[in-house]
């Protein structure tokens, strides 16, 4: 498995790789290749981590390069992968390579490698660019990374188009994303399998509220309904839409807003009252924030299938989000959450006000949300379906190779 992010878990892709790997059956050998992260390797100076917390013994981790969130570090990791991954694959007699949508295998040719490659499509440059162009017309608060995506979008989009070809096989985490790949990239539908990401509903659970109160006593003392925004402080996440909605909410009812996530606070005008700003939080913190919150809000302009929504639903939060990407596949509007149009601060304010004022509605929505996650989103099942897809791909690849070699 090739991934730009892994341990320590700081994003949805890293968590996806972790959960799929550790939920495979015991006889599946998994070798994860990822950039080096010094905090993880402090006690492992050889750069190879055979086991780590939460990893079973059949999972090995090799660190190549250094972790970073920048485009140029992504390119560096692609170069490193092109040099070392074929060697690792031959030495360990790898049956299949599973890559992620940051395209770490961009410079590796599946036909030359003679090993099938499956890529999970989490997001696309094109999708980001379209959302940011729309946001830029009504907002001047784009983050530096968002401005870079707008600037380089056309170039990166061409690189992306060269990657998404019928030489590879694909997993998408939503039906919406599968259709995007068919329509925009011309990928054969038979080469795409939809396998949803999931949530660990034992970790993300309202039963952890006492732990949460001990961890955040100042939030536990807040009596007003608590509204959590836990995501990157970025325009494409609808941050400025939320900030425009908050004054309208507070003019009608009482509520307390909690902001947590990566990004610089000064880039956005925070409300003058009724809020707590936590900034970037460690990976063990989100379950406590969900458990303490009544409402979760993610007013994104572009998403695929955001894990944070499932985590909030598992925690019995009433979720308010937008009708973009795969989100409508996750939420049944009015039953286990609320869906609104993107970039609509008035609709957002109305929905937040209604939920803040109606405790019974919040509770019913949260209960149905957790039931939905438990019934539909199980990591063990997702890992099993992923393994089944691997087996199908390997069988197809072997058949085509035998036909080619005659």
Where are these regions (language model features)?
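Aromatic "clamp/platform" in nucleotide-sugar-dependent glycosyltransferases that forms part
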Residues: 282, 301
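Membrane-proximal helix-turn-helix segments that form the acceptor-binding/catalytic region
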Residues: 142-170
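A short helix/loop element that forms part of the nucleotide-sugar donor recognition site in Leloir-type
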Residues: 47-49, 205-220
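Conserved acidic donor-binding segment of nucleotide-sugar-dependent glycosyltransferases
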Residues: 333-334, 338-345, 354-359
């Amino acid at each position: 498995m090739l991934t730009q992010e892994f341990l320590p878990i700081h994003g949805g892709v890293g968590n996806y790789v972790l959960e799929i790997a550790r939920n495979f059956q015991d006889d599946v050998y998994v070798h994860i290749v990822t950039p080096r992260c010094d905090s993880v390797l402090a006690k492992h100076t050889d750069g190879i981590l055979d086991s780590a917390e939460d990893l079973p013994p059949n999972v090995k981790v090799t660190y190549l390069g250094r972790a970073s969130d920048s485009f140029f570090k992504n390119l560096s990791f692609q170069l490193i992968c092109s040099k070392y991954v074929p060697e690792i694959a031959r030495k360990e007699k790898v049956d299949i390579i599973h890559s992620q949508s940051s395209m770490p295998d961009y410079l590796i040719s599946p036909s030359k490698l003679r090993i099938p490659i499956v890529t999970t499509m989490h997001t696309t440059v094109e999708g980001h660019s379209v959302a940011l162009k729309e946001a830029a017309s009504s907002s001047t608060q784009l983050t530096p990374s968002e401005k870079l995506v707008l600037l380089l979008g056309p170039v990166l989009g061409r690189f992306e188009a060269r990657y998404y070809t019928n030489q590879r096989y694909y997993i998408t985490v939503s039906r919406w994303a599968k259709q995007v790949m068919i329509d925009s990239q011309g990928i054969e539908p038979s080469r795409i399998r939809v396998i949803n990401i999931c949530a660990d509903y034992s970790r993300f659970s309202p039963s952890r509220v006492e732990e949460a109160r001990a961890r955040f006593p100042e939030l536990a003392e807040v009596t007003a309904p608590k509204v959590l925004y836990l995501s990157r402080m970025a325009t494409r996440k609808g941050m400025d839409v939320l900030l425009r909605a908050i004054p309208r909410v507070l003019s009608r009812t009482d509520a307390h807003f909690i902001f947590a996530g990566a990004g610089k606070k000064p880039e956005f005008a925070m409300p003058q009252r009724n809020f707590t700003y936590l900034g970037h939080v460690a990976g063990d913190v989100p379950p406590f924030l969900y458990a303490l919150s009544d409402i979760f809000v993610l007013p994104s302009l572009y998403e695929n299938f955001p894990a944070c929504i499932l985590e909030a639903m598992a925690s019995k939060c009433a979720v308010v989000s937008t009708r973009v990407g795969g989100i409508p596949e996750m939420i049944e509007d009015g039953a286990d959450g609320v869906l609104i149009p993107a970039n609509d601060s008035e609709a957002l304010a109305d929905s937040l006000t209604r939920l803040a004022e109606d405790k019974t509605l919040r509770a019913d929505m949260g209960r149905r949300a957790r039931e939905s996650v438990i019934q539909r989103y199980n990591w063990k099942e997702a890992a099993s379906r992923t393994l089944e897809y691997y087996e199908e791909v390997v069988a197809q690849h072997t058949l085509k190779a035998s036909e080619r070699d005659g």
